[in-house]
Design a protein with these regions (language model features):
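Zn-dependent metallopeptidase/amidohydrolase metal-coordination segment
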Residues: 299, 304-368
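Midchain, well-structured core segments that form catalytic/ion-binding scaffolds
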Residues: 150-151, 155-264
Length: 368
């Protein structure tokens, strides 16, 4: 059956690429809240178009008030969930071609969102379409879930989980290969002081953050483990708010640390200053040899003939909030620094390869 699935993806390739181009041409940057469009009209229109395409492929669809939507194949309570996102970051400067043009050259497509994340989630839709067209009867239904707020806060997924039960297994195609079995925790910490404390405040920030190693060694927070690596500080932001000075820092931390350790350690050193956590996600970890991870590794190795040993990531995906899913693709080893950048790209060959990997992933998980 694997070979039939692979051949079906090849047959669907041209149609898939055209639909991907249609979606990446839509400028789905977050806009102003409107009635019926919580993340702005452009994202709402993009979700409408994706669900229209899914309906044309014969899927049942559901739009959850333009927060998020999904296409489903099969019936049942416990389902396999594959979640990506349609919202994109602003385009910025430095593009060779119009950033929403889906410009094709030498086997590459250049466009904001082609990698992060419209292209990959559309390959998942077509992977499921191949399964449906082959009339493969899976043991569980499968949902392709189209998020609309991954870049700015996960409010889409929060809304989804208030109205729908989570999947029993699945993935998000918004990271890298091979399958990612663990994500670091993430904590955004704010340190604030009154204006009259300006000298003390900047001395502290310079000493422990701006003129320090990013592993938080000066703070005594240079925790590390074999799987996750060392703690990392990133995303420094300095603000002046209502007679207060505020410094924000994000900790990407390994599983042998806790949020309490981070906050209390900084509080001990930042005397007379306020230290608060404004956002936090716990580390996510699955066993490397659990059935879901093992079968996704098998799908990756079957198509690419590369080593599928599961890996960890310092990044953050929907897996932080959506239970029972792992990051899986779309970037192959060596492909870095593409998303969020000018001239964001993806090879057409890689889009097709992703669709094949994802189709086998659906097939393997669906037959459990």
């Amino acid at each position: 059956m694997e070979e039939e699935i692979i051949k079906k993806i090849d047959m669907l390739s041209l149609k898939m690429i055209e639909d991907i181009k249609t979606i990446v041409k839509m400028p789905s940057v977050e806009g102003t809240f409107q009635q019926g469009a919580p993340f702005g009209k452009d994202i709402a229109l993009t979700l409408d178009k994706v669900l229209e395409i899914a309906q044309s492929l014969g899927f049942e669809t559901k739009n959850l008030d333009h927060y998020i939507g999904y296409a489903q194949y099969g019936k049942g309570e416990d389902y396999i969930g594959i979640i990506g996102h349609l919202d994109v970051v602003p385009t910025g400067l430095g593009w060779k071609h119009l950033p929403f043009s889906a410009y094709e050259e030498d086997g590459y497509i250049y466009s904001r969102g082609i990698l992060d994340n419209k292209g990959p989630i559309m390959t998942c839709l077509y992977a499921l379409y191949a399964i449906k067209e082959l009339n493969i009867k899976l043991h569980k239904p499968v949902r392709i879930i189209f998020g609309c707020d991954e870049e700015t806060g996960f409010k889409d997924l929060e809304y989804y989980l208030k109205h729908e039960k989570p999947p029993v297994m699945g993935w998000t195609p918004d990271c890298k290969y091979p399958v990612v079995y663990a994500e670091r925790g993430r904590a955004v910490i704010e340190i604030s002081a009154k204006e009259k404390q300006v000298d003390e405040f900047f001395l502290f920030i310079n000493n422990y953050f701006l003129n320090a190693n990013t592993n938080a060694e000066k703070l005594g927070l240079d925790f590390k483990d074999e799987e996750f690596g060392i703690n990392e500080m990133r995303n420094f932001v300095l603000k002046h708010e209502k007679s207060k000075l505020v410094f924000s820092v994000t900790f990407s931390y390994p599983a042998n640390m806790t949020l309490e350790t981070i906050v209390e350690t900084i509080r001990e050193k930042a005397k007379n200053m306020e230290v608060t956590c404004v956002q936090h996600y716990f580390p996510v970890k699955f066993e490397k040899d659990c059935p879901m991870v093992s079968l996704l590794s098998k799908a990756y190795e079957k198509i690419t003939h590369l080593d599928g040993t599961p890996v960890t990531t310092t990044g953050g995906t929907y897996a932080k909030l959506m239970p029972h899913i792992v990051p899986f693709g779309p970037s192959f080893p060596g492909q870095k620094g593409i998303g969020h950048q000018p001239n964001e790209w993806m090879k057409i060959e890689d889009l097709n390869t992703n669709a094949k990997i994802y189709a086998l992933g659906i097939y393997y998980l669906g037959m459990l």
